[in-house]
Amino acid sequence: GGDLYLESLAGHNLRRLTHSEAAEEAPHFSPDGRRIAFVRGFDLYVLDLASGAETRLTTDGQENVALNGTNDWVYGEEIWNRQPEGFWWSPDSSRIAFYHFDETPVGVYTLLDDTPLYPKVTSQKYPKSGEPNPLVKVGVVDVAGGKTAWLGTGEPDSYLARVDWTPKGDAVAVQRLSRDQKHLDLLRCGANDGTCSPLLSETWHTWINLGQDFRFLPDGRFLWGSERDGWRRLYLYGADGRGGQPVTPEGWAVTALDGVAADGSWAVVTAFPTAGLGAVDRKVARVSLKSAGWEILTPEPGSHSAAAISPQTGAWVHTWSDADTPARSEVRPDGGKLIALPSAAPTFDAASLPKWEILTIPGPDGSRLPARLLKPAGFDPSHRYPVIIYHYGGPGSQVVDNAWSVRSLWHKLMAQRGFAVFSVDNQSSLFFGKHGEDKDYRRFGTVNLAGQLAGVDYLKSLPWVDASRLGLWGWSGGGSNTLYCVLNRPGVWKAAIAGAPVTDWRLYDSIWTERYLDRPENNADGYRDSSPITYTANLKDHLLVVHGLADDNVHPQNSINLSGDLIKAGVPFEQAFYPGQKHGFRGPSSRHFYERATEFFERELAP
């Protein structure tokens, strides 16, 4: 198992804390540093560091049946950004609030590992769109053990999406999101009796995007992120839920609440200006919670983020990159000397790789769409070049940014091999705010297709582009949209790669899919028309479909079913399945995929 060890920062004094066959997961120190809580065998435990004594706080944990203190798959993926832990210490370290999941209603997806002599079967509880979700509740238990107080959150088929203790530790704040994701309540629940009452509520006609930008101040007031005016801003509420005054300025959208001062006088956020191409960058800003003052701490172009902010001193770790420079980090003491941290950036500065250009192009209905262009190395305007187009295309997504990515490095490799590389974000992307995202409600594909066709029109206007040699590719939702594009506009792109695509939206998980498409029984036409598998007989272009056989997010069932339909239609295509690989490839499989993608585009587009 994975036992826990404790090492003193003052010296090499490694101490083993647990001796168990089962692994300890999601360990977290109590606020006073005297205990560690963790999950073992789907139950919640507390270990006293002074005595070494363990206390088991729950007893009914069982795989695929009951989970305590840990997220089930769909909550971890869609609500908590793949965070495993599902428990929260009280401020005084005396109690723990935790999730309890009843997974018995949830259907099972079976993943098969064919690599051993006898294949290994893994059963995954995975609620597909329209199917039963896990039943979740929040309990509060004393660290000494004893009876759990269950919070009366009501509405069992809703999502209990965020859990936070009040500063005094006498209550727990729970964000309850309706299953259709149109209504969000912030509940205040007594930690002793479990009685809940609403502090505030929000409603939106399509769906509400959950944020991680709720934070209590020491005096009980709280910060709350909302897109009520079409862009995400922070609002300051009284402890009773009244008020709700904006503290971040109009014309800026907040993407993260990074930290709050110990005395509640300021907050640090990551944000971008909403006008024009402002969203390509990310700025770190400090907002005064006394005067609503707004100070940009990172005015330079690029993608900036803040981490490890000291609530006492205001010191923080600043990380920065741009489209052509890998991330650099530095410690920024409040008023002190900058401390640079190690970076790989100087190596790439000397590599003379092709540089990205960020621009706008004409879009549907007179709009301007954000785009990125990478010209081939040794660019000659009298030559005609093939173009690889990379996209994602989902609601609120963003590909066109001024930030480094590993995938961008492969695009630069392709530019060195004679390709131009291009991306365009459509009218439902992050650049157009919540009202833009809403264009995808109950129907995927059409908005992105219009954006990609606008991109093709722009490329055709460039005299050095050979529009007969256009390639399209994407991963996950981008793989789905790649299929949708080539199947609905055959002949526009000569070759395409669809990586880990959803091919039938009935096969994807409940939280993500229902947010945008509603339930299948309420929107059968939308599911049919949004699913690439509906159009398989239309395939005319060269297609490579790629999927990991251990993908527990977008199941290989999607690509297997697509392959079957393409075979029935008598349509030629290529496919590559990767044993043991999940939704993102690692190790030799990642290298193999990029080598395969390079070979595919060079063969089909012949620079």
Specify the residue positions occupied by each region the protein language model found.
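Beta-propeller folds
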Residues: 1-316, 321-325, 331-332, 353, ...
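Serine-hydrolase catalytic core recognition
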Residues: 108, 169, 175, 298, ...
